[in-house]
Amino acid sequence: MAAGKLKKEQQNQSAERESADTGKVNDEDEEHLYGNIDDYKHLIQDEEYDDEDVPHDLQLSEDEYNSERDSSLLAEFSDYGEISEDDEEDFMNAIREASNFKVKKKKKNDKGKSYGRQRKERVLDPEVAQLLSQANEAFVRNDLQVAERLFNEVIKKDARNFAAYETLGDIYQLQGRLNDCCNSWFLAAHLNASDWEFWKIVAILSADLDHVRQAIYCFSRVISLNPMEWESIYRRSMLYKKTGQLARALDGFQRLYMYNPYDANILRELAILYVDYDRIEDSIELYMKVFNANVERREAILAALENALDSSDEESAAEGEDADEKEPLEQDEDRQMFPDINWKKIDAKYKCIPFDWSSLNILAELFLKLAVSEVDGIKTIKKCARWIQRRESQTFWDHVPDDSEFDNRRFKNSTFDSLLAAEKEKSYNIPIDIRVRLGLLRLNTDNLVEALNHFQCLYDETFSDVADLYFEAATALTRAEKYKEAIDFFTPLLSLEEWRTTDVFKPLARCYKEIESYETAKEFYELAIKSEPDDLDIRVSLAEVYYRLNDPETFKHMLVDVVEMRKHQVDETLHRISNEKSSNDTSDISSKPLLEDSKFRTFRKKKRTPYDAERERIERERRITAKVVDKYEKMKKFELNSGLNEAKQASIWINTVSELVDIFSSVKNFFMKSRSRKFVGILRRTKKFNTELDFQIERLSKLAEGDSVFEGPLMEERVTLTSATELRGLSYEQWFELFMELSLVIAKYQSVEDGLSVVETAQEVNVFFQDPERVKMMKFVKLAIVLQMDDEEELAENLRGLLNQFQFNRKVLQVFMYSLCRGPSSLNILSSTIQQKFFLRQLKAFDSCRYNTEVNGQASITNKEVYNPNKKSSPYLYYIYAVLLYSSRGFLSALQYLTRLEEDIPDDPMVNLLMGLSHIHRAMQRLTAQRHFQIFHGLRYLYRYHKIRKSLYTDLEKQEADYNLGRAFHLIGLVSIAIEYYNRVLENYDDGKLKKHAAYNSIIIYQQSGNVELADHLMEKYLSI
């Protein structure tokens, strides 16, 4: 410390004498000087340094120090005289320490030289002594240029001359060349390595010049020489903290705190480091220890007060004298209230840092950062506040669920009303910053009413004094998705010019966007862009607002700009990284320290601790659950009140439900790896994005293309499932219903493909596909959507999937026929040989179950519950297979299976119709010798079909029977009889569908017979528009 004062005095005196024409060193000297410094930099390379006080961050992986460089160093620093082996070794160790080299152990000799023995005073060469004398004289007369030149000459001839380096540094300091001064003193310190005070001067100067690495090294040398130099430990710890070396900074402050646990500044720094190191609970514990110590002290004061009257006057007088010698540093209020107690004894036994409102404010912030102990935080803050206000006896407030003790609501409390007047007159108001933090904790527990009660106290304060608290409350409300309330606290900030920034415009615009006030949102997003035109996130949000305002041109234009700017920013980042090294290499050499900061090992922030991740997960899950429940309730109300009759109303419903489904789909736990695949529908479950901005650009790009893409999760996430029946506030059955309803509504009102993608996502969810009933429902919903598509292959695949899963199920077989009742795609599927082979294998599988034997070519048995003791056949399988054979013109084969059906269901109209048509078509193929007999046989079945329809069915089926019989006669050329049945269709029934077909066929017959007038009449009556 004395050396530091000496340097300052010397600087002040010399500065007064310094002439105005003091110039820079000549070019030759400067070149020589920096040439030397470059040599020294090469010498100060990074190897392992053995001293435990020197930080390991200074250890670099370089080549080992070799003997050639040792020799060159000695040659440069040689005084042209013989030097002892010990002198050589000591000096080399000093240079190795300067460059973080490993210090070599001294060789043992037979002389028994003791370790650490002082070396003899060096004898200077006469020439060097003469130059040094001349340099000192020039320095004294303030001829700094001459002095600098002479000292450089001294260093050339005697590179180990401490005085030359030290005084040369003084000259640079007077000239304002502080970096050169620091470098010179740094070398001088190595030549006088045992002077820790000089090391400290160099360390402080290095820190002032922001030469962090060099400053840390110098402070480490100070601490290694004087482990009790607490200022150096403090300064080095602050440098560690600055460079992100949290573990080393924490170690330093822990040592300081152990040495002086009553320094509030050290306590605060240690608490901050604990927070930075993700040890928030340790920070809270520090302040709780201080609080408990204060509680214990107050209890001791109250106990001592009872015995104060028994103490002697002499003892009190002695204590008064001692008190005069050492004034108390804290608890002045206690001394004023209780002046007669034995304060000497209290201070000696119960010394502690005072716990006041400032300490409580810090404690409240720590509980906010902890995020998982809001309830405990609220209780602790209330307890501490009562203690500060000397109301610690009012413990009944601990059982009050709200914070009414701090406002006028306390007068409604019966227990408070029964207190003594002295207790009621005590202070109950808390500082506004603590009240706001208490409100933030309440908000984190989803107690919005109590939180707003605290925030509204801001209205009673001078606005300019608490503007930052307005912003803090508004930001927290935005984070909690209470957008309308957040607007109330953001809006007043606009009246202050210093708050009209992007930090306010951006969240305020988001709030207006969320409440669908898009015009106002657009205004604030535009203001934010004026403040920060390169912020792409704001531009993306504004583009989305234009989309919501039905301005597609501006939306697409902004989106193109954002994409281009994003590419440009990525290119700029890569270019900047590639140029960093070259820019560092070309920096001015005169501004570099000997130990360059660029050689620091790159600091990597430590990974998040499991505790930190768990805390964030709990907080996030709580917010998501509240959002899910809220949206679900809104969706239910909308469904009940508005219905889904209009496409516009359906779109609103779809938007709400899509957000819920996206939240569910983001949970990676639900998707088995073996079943996961890329998903390209409205729910992008497998695509991952590097940043939120990339996701937003991708999503808006889909909107620009007209796709139905809704905002969803950014990336897959893994969630700890704590319940087997629900997720995020909804039961799995409710989630399943949302998926199914959403798929059907989207398929109906928007896009069949998007509706199908929702079902496919649900089929990949393990909690769904492990439930047989849900699996059945998903397959039928998917079939219902596929039926709206004109995709023959997709329909056939889904039908086969159903038939395989629900093997031999008659309802599923009915669904198969219902699904293929119209259109050319249905006929193509029925006539496909693939379907014929599929059902033949199913028939064989059924027969194997029926006769309890293996059948060659049968399908695998998936239905293990087939019970057929009477060995009955399956009419559904026979009928479907017969239809497939009939559709592919295999009439004879079809008749074989239809004949088997006739035995079981002789009065089924469709069996008789198919048998009749099969006989007729077989006869028309001219592949039988008795064609006319087969036609008669076919007509017999057709008349039976007609009779069954006429006697047992409605007019619609009767009309169908007349038409089919007429069409059969038309086929075999008996047109007069065909016309009779066609006329029945035209005249006896009201339904017009078959009338058009009957009229068209009648027109063909009349035209062939030459009756054009009657044909025109039918054309005009039935086929004209």
Swiss-Prot record:
Q: Could you say what the effect of mutating A164V is?
A: In PCF1-19; increases RNA polymerase III gene transcription
Q: Which PROSITE patterns match?
A: TPR (PS50005), TPR_REGION (PS50293)
- TPR repeats, residue ranges: 128-161, 162-195, 196-229, 230-263, 264-297, 432-465, 467-501, 502-535, 536-569, 875-908, 959-992
* Outcome when changing W199R: In PCF1-15; increases RNA polymerase III gene transcription
Gene Ontology cellular component terms for the protein in this record: cytoplasm; nucleoplasm; nucleus; transcription factor TFIIIC complex
| Keyword DNA-binding tagged | yes
Protein's GO biological process:
5S class rRNA transcription by RNA polymerase III; transcription by RNA polymerase III; transcription initiation at RNA polymerase III promoter
Resulting phenotype, V504K:
RNA polymerase III defective
What's the impact of mutating E148K?
Answer: In PCF1-17; increases RNA polymerase III gene transcription
Q: Where is the composition biased (Acidic residues)?
A: 46-65, 311-325
Q: Which residues, renumbered to this chain, carry the PTM Phosphoserine?
A: S311
GO MF term (any one) = DNA binding
Task: Give me the ranges of the annotated region Disordered.
Answer: 1-71, 309-334
User: Which residue ranges does the record annotate as region Sufficient to bind BDP1?
Assistant: 128-569
**Function in brief:** TFIIIC mediates tRNA and 5S RNA gene activation by binding to intragenic promoter elements. Upstream of the transcription start site, TFIIIC assembles the initiation complex TFIIIB-TFIIIC-tDNA, which is sufficient for RNA polymerase III recruitment and function. Part of the tauA domain of TFIIIC that binds boxA DNA promoter sites of tRNA and similar genes. TFC4 is the TFIIIB-assembling subunit of TFIIIC and essential for viability.
Query: What quaternary arrangement does the UniProt entry report?
Result: Component of the TFIIIC complex composed of TFC1, TFC3, TFC4, TFC6, TFC7 and TFC8. The subunits are organized in two globular domains, tauA and tauB, connected by a proteolysis-sensitive and flexible linker. Interacts with TFC1, TFC3, TFC6, TFIIIB subunits BRF1 and BDP1, and with RNA polymerase III subunit RPC10.
What's the protein name? Transcription factor tau 131 kDa subunit
Q: What organism is this sequence from?
A: Saccharomyces cerevisiae (strain ATCC 204508 / S288c) (Baker's yeast)
Gene of this entry: TFC4
